[in-house]
C-alpha cells in the first residue's frame, strides 16, 4: 500500500504516551495505533478522568475495512455505528491498552467493565452459561490486583474468540499473558463497550474516526514512535 501523506503518530492522553506502533512479546505480532482517548465519569457535576484507552490494530485490518469505508469522511465514520462494529468484528487481532490516570483496585476496575459487558451481551442475546463462566474467569483475574497511576491492562481480542489479559506496572507489554479466556461474545463485548453504541470513551471513538480515513484511503505509514 502507498504511504499516507500524514503518517500516524503517537498520541498523548494526559501524561500517558501511546506509541504509533507496538509489538507484543507474547504473540510476536505488531499493531498500529488506531486511536486513543480518555475514559472518565461525571461525579457531582465534574468530569473525572480515570483511564487512557488505546486501540491497536493489525495491518490487515486496513484491507478488511477499506472495502466498505474507503473514501468516507471522518464525520461519516463517526456517525456510523456499523464502522465501529466492523472494527470489532474484523478478521484480525485487536490489542487494547487501558492505562490508569488514578489509582484503582482490580475489583473496582473490573466491576464496571463486567457490568458493561454483561449488559451488552444480554441486550444482544449472547449471554448464556458459557458467558457467565467467562465473566467469572475475568473477575478472578483482577481479584488480587491494584492499579496505581501509570499501570496498564492489555486486552488481546482475537477473531477466533480469545480474550488475552496482560497486566503491567507501566506501559510495557509483558512477556506472557496472565490469562486467556475462550469466549467470543465476551472478547468482542470488551471493545464494543469502549467504541460501540454506548461507548465509555467518546474521545476514543472520535480519535479513530479522525485518524483512520487517511490510512484507509492511502495506506499505512508509521512515524514518531
Swiss-Prot record:
It is an enzyme of class 5 (isomerase). Substrate binds at residues 51, 116, 193. It catalyses: a chalcone = a flavanone. One of its GO terms (molecular function) is chalcone isomerase activity. The record marks 109 as: Important for catalytic activity. Its EC number is 5.5.1.6. Pathway: Secondary metabolite biosynthesis; flavonoid biosynthesis. The keyword Protein transport does not apply. Signal peptide: none annotated. Keywords: Flavonoid biosynthesis, Isomerase. GO terms for biological process: flavonoid biosynthetic process. Part of the biosynthetic pathway for all classes of flavonoids, a large class of secondary plant metabolites, many of which are brightly colored. Catalyzes the intramolecular cyclization of bicyclic chalcones into tricyclic (S)-flavanones. Responsible for the isomerization of 4,2',4',6'-tetrahydroxychalcone (also termed chalcone) into naringenin. Belongs to the chalcone isomerase family. This is Chalcone--flavanone isomerase 3.
